[in-house]
Amino acid sequence: MPFGLTNAPSTFQEVINDVFMEYLDDFVMVYIDDILIFSRTEEDHFRHVKLILTRLRQHKLFAKLSKCEFNRASLPFLGHVVGQNGVEMQQSKVQALAAWPRLTTVTEVQSFLGLANYYRRFIRDFARISAPLSELTKKGVPFEWGGDQENSFRSLKDAVKSAPVRQLADPAKPYIVTCDASDVGIGAVLEQESENGPHPVAFASRKLSGAEKNYPVHERELLAIVYALKEWRPYLHGSRFVIKTDHH
């Protein structure tokens, strides 16, 4: 398929989805030309790899051997490192964000937030932390770099550098949903117990709308709970879970 065509990525994605339709989310994930095969055992993995390579050959699609990695316990995939213990941020991306120079224009703010936002599921209260920077991207807002923006910039860098490995969800275990609300936004953490105590599965947050900022504290806390239940419905529906909030 020629490069540069507007619909080329979506068309190729549709084709590759059709090729692997019966295997998708069972033991393979595909994004454009990135193919990830995952298995519970080495024996299953050899069988899965053979099925995928056979299907590629049947459709006259070919993988470049030098770009393939086989039988790995973990590997990078779409900016993440995926392994049997969970999902973490790719170190090259962490280093890029940590070394980002001070922002001096709206365009630079947008670029920084664009990359940071991609990893918001690793950062607790991302919406609250990033609020002073995201305000600078609004139409008609003058670019003024002050203490709030500097603190936001540094806090996001620190959060990225200390981001935890997100544990893979275990449907057999109960979940812990911890919710919080501030004057700026609402956020939640989805966790499950592990040998070392509660471990994060995902983080979620968003800013409050103008009307929501006028809610009393207990209603903002309730809003955070409703938001978390909707956000993680695929995990929580039919599962046991506990909700924690700091408002009584």
Where are the predicted features?
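A short, polar/acidic, helix/strand-boundary loop motif
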Residues: M1-T11, N196-L223, H247-H248
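Active-site palm subdomain of RNA-directed nucleic acid polymerases
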Residues: P9-R47, F122, F126, K230-F241
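RNase H-like nuclease module associated with reverse transcription
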Residues: S111, N117, N214-H248
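Two-metal-ion RNase H-like nuclease active-site motif
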Residues: P174-A181
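Acidic, metal-ligating active-site segments
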Residues: D183-Q192
